Amino acid sequence: MDKDLTYQIKELKKEKNAIILAHFYQPPEIQELADAVGDSYYLSEIARDCKEEVVVFCGVRFMGESAKILSPEKTVLMPVSNAGCAMADMVDEEGVIKLKQQYPNALVVCYINSTAKVKAHCDVSVTSSSAIKILENIDNKEIIFLPDKNLGGYIAEQFPDKNFIFWDGYCKYHNNIRAEEIIELKDKYKNAEVLVHPECKKEIRDLGDYVGSTSGIIKYATNSKNKDFIIATEEGILHELKKNNPNKNFYIPGGKILCTDMKKTTLENLYSTLKNMENEVIVEDEIMEKALNSLLNMHKLAEG
């Protein structure tokens, strides 16, 4: 890590009254520098509750938007303005409106991996760590879930009494994980436990000893007496896993699962963003007002 640049970023942070948030999929040097590292739900709480006036969000676009919607009075910056999420872009507001017309009695639940414009048409947002708790607190029997059909399928398995209508979206990195890659690793490391993110396909989830969010995977591996783990999610999580468990071994199916947009953040663009107060996240007032409802409901139902 560039110590001089790191020092300058820390000084700028004090000067600007800023907090740096980083997702588990961010590069190791960014995670090390961040004030808080976590999954989407945890980071949305920090963004909402922090006292700092400036939030620098090291992640992808929908995360910065969610932070701005939850804290409109704060300045939210992103080191890379074009760090997107292909899954979030698979659904548009016209598609949501059409589905709502088709299923007028359905509650519209969106994965937080959605754009602000889509959230504006949804009743509640969920994250992979909060989804089950939230759905437990929802009485509706008919649910439109978007955009991730894999996470939606996992949630639907926990609620057989509810009827789910899915959007045909997915995370290409999780969706591309193949069962053979996991079986191959299981043959090599006989006692390894398989920890799977619910954005994976059902055939991958079925191979898992545990299915859960990034924070859930880290907690499970840390508490387990096992020494070997096969990790079916983006490889950025390995930094926190190895940091918490230096004597344990972690293996990625296929050897590599890398989200290119999550890896766009660098110390250089983080420094530039703070120094010049650039790449501010702007969400139109009308969209922000409508989208806020789904995020407030997320926190209310997850904490209820």
Curated annotation (Swiss-Prot):
Keywords: 4Fe-4S, Cytoplasm, Iron, Iron-sulfur, Metal-binding, Pyridine nucleotide biosynthesis, Transferase. It catalyses: iminosuccinate + dihydroxyacetone phosphate = quinolinate + phosphate + 2 H2O + H(+). InterPro entries: NadA, NadA_sf, Quinolinate_synth_type2. Its cofactor is [4Fe-4S] cluster. Binds 1 [4Fe-4S] cluster per subunit. Iminosuccinate binds at H23, S40, Y111, I112, N113, S128, H197, P198, E199, T214. [4Fe-4S] cluster binds at C85, C171, C259. It comes from the Bacteria. GO terms for biological process: 'de novo' NAD biosynthetic process from L-aspartate. GO terms for cellular component: cytosol. Disulfide bonds: none annotated. The keyword Ribosomal protein does not apply. Its EC number is 2.5.1.72. Catalyzes the condensation of iminoaspartate with dihydroxyacetone phosphate to form quinolinate. Belongs to the quinolinate synthase family. Type 2 subfamily. This is Quinolinate synthase. It comes from Clostridioides difficile (strain 630). The gene is nadA.
